[in-house]
A protein has these predicted regions:
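Glycine-centered tight beta-turn/hairpin loop motif at sheet-sheet or coil-to-beta transitions
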Residues: 124-126
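Short helix/turn-capping signatures at newly exposed starts of structured segments
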Residues: 1-116, 128, 133-156
């Protein structure tokens, strides 16, 4: 079986792009800014990532009660439909490459295995990024500085 993944460099470049954006922003503003990285606005607080040609291209946007963007996530790999040793090796390798690249750029990650392996970085400027190795994919969640501050105040 063959699966696709965006490069770890591309995933981290996307995070760096969003970390360097002016915050706060509404979901509509985020959708428009996303066009600079090849993402297209979609219905109702969503974006689409056609550039990396992964099996799941949706980029859902979460919003705070104030109407500001809280976070959004994107797939760094295809979604694996048939589980097995080959799929596990693919996902493990892609996750390891992503964590290695993130560590080179942002320093040591806070690691967790609570719901599967994940690595979290609190970035300069206040934003937060989490790379996760799920059962069927590797994902990246970007949290805006405003919502990351809320999470820190809650002890998360």
């Amino acid at each position: 079986m063959t699966w696709k993944a965006m490069s770890a460099e591309r995933a981290c470049d996307l995070v760096d792009f969003w970390a360097g954006a002016p915050w706060p922003q509404t979901p509509e503003q985020v959708q428009q800014l996303g066009t600079q990285v090849g993402w297209t606005p979609d219905d109702d607080e969503m974006m689409d990532n056609p550039v990396d040609r992964l099996s799941e291209s949706a980029v859902p946007i979460a919003t705070m009660p104030s109407g500001e963007t809280a976070s959004f996530s994107f797939w760094a790999t295809d979604v694996v439909r048939e589980l097995g040793a080959e799929a596990d090796e693919f996902l493990d390798d892609q996750y390891a490459l992503l964590v290695r690249q993130g560590t080179q750029r942002w320093g040591r990650a806070e690691q967790s295995d609570a719901d599967g392996p994940s690595a979290q970085w609190d970035l300069d400027g206040g934003s937060r990024v989490v790379a996760s190795r799920g059962r069927r994919s590797v994902t990246v969640e970007f949290t805006t500085p405003q919502y990351a501050q809320v999470l820190r105040e809650l002890g998360e």
